[in-house]
Amino acid sequence: MEFGRLITAMVTPFNDRLEVDYVRAAELANHLVNTGSDGIVVAGTTGESPTLTKDEKIRLFSTVVDAVGDRASVIAGTGSYDTEATIELSRKAKEAGVDGLLLVGPYYNKPPQEGYYQHFAAVAKAVPLPIMLYNIPGRTGSNIIPATVARLMAFDNIVAIKEAAGSMDQVSEVVRLARPDFKVYSGDDSLTLPILSVGGHGIVSVASHLVGKEIQKMIAACINGNISEAARIHRELYPLFKGLFITSNPICVKAALNLLGRPVGGVRLPLVEANDQEVAAMRQLIESYGLDASCQETVA
């Protein structure tokens, strides 16, 4: 399964009562495909997975699958700190028709490396879907080291990793150890080009809600050998990449989408709405990049 090079970690739209707005979720998924996304992660960190119920996640999986059809891959965020619960939700995601699974490293209980291995191995054995591992020690509290990732490559359906440790040394080692068909994705927009330069495959992006086509151009320039053009686009987009993370994600990207007239609602506690300074910062970014609600949308 080829997930694509630009995958958007989609926000979960809520209505004024902070209920999931499935109509707007379908609309947003279509918008993302029309603005350059090859794939969509549903109910990941950016989708506020910790505050979504199991039933909400399953319905979101089906909603996005139905919305995008075969125009993009749909990857379900089903990982948790409970192996059996992860397997159960992953099976439901398969029934919903998703193309793959995003499995975050178990958080809070901080397993040793053998625990990470056995957790991911159990899911890979139980659910015959392509799996993207997700390493984000800044959120989980523990790092999945490259040697553990290499062990997990023995499972044919573990096909990729979203690497968000923020370490180019770690990415370089994972790429060095990877089997030929194993894909390494950046988990940070600002590190997309550096990770591509050492053999990474793509990005699981937040900024692609706003500048998907420009990110696609940067990726294409890099893989086609036009490094100077890729670097130019990277430099141009860098303030946006960083600006969307001046507070906890997805607070800012939701604020930006709302300002652009593409309503996605607020965030669920314990996250809080963007404050006045953060809203002002998003407004300034929108104006400086000349963004509007279409975000350069092209209807297929």
Swiss-Prot record:
Positions of the record's site feature: Part of a proton relay during catalysis: T45, Y108
Listed SMART domains: DHDPS (SM01130)
Catalysis: reaction(s): L-aspartate 4-semialdehyde + pyruvate = (2S,4S)-4-hydroxy-2,3,4,5-tetrahydrodipicolinate + H2O + H(+)
Family the UniProt entry places it in: Belongs to the DapA family.
Coiled coil: none
Transmembrane region(s): none
Pathway(s) where this gene product acts: Amino-acid biosynthesis; L-lysine biosynthesis via DAP pathway; (S)-tetrahydrodipicolinate from L-aspartate: step 3/4
EC number assigned by the record: 4.3.3.7
Residues engaged in binding pyruvate: T46, V204
InterPro entries: Aldolase_TIM, DapA, DapA-like, Schiff_base-form_aldolases_AS, Schiff_base-form_aldolases_CS
Primary site of residence: cytoplasm
Keywords: Amino-acid biosynthesis, Cytoplasm, Diaminopimelate biosynthesis, Lyase, Lysine biosynthesis, Schiff base
Name of the protein in question: 4-hydroxy-tetrahydrodipicolinate synthase
Protein role: Catalyzes the condensation of (S)-aspartate-beta-semialdehyde [(S)-ASA] and pyruvate to 4-hydroxy-tetrahydrodipicolinate (HTPA).
Assembly and interaction partners: Homotetramer; dimer of dimers.
Molecular function as annotated in GO: 4-hydroxy-tetrahydrodipicolinate synthase activity
One Pfam family per UniProt: DHDPS
Location of this chain's protein in the cell: Cytoplasm
CDD domains reported in the protein's UniProt record: DHDPS (cd00950)
GO biological process, one term: lysine biosynthetic process via diaminopimelate
NCBIfam families associated with the record: dapA
Top EC class for this record: lyase
Active site feature: Y134, K162
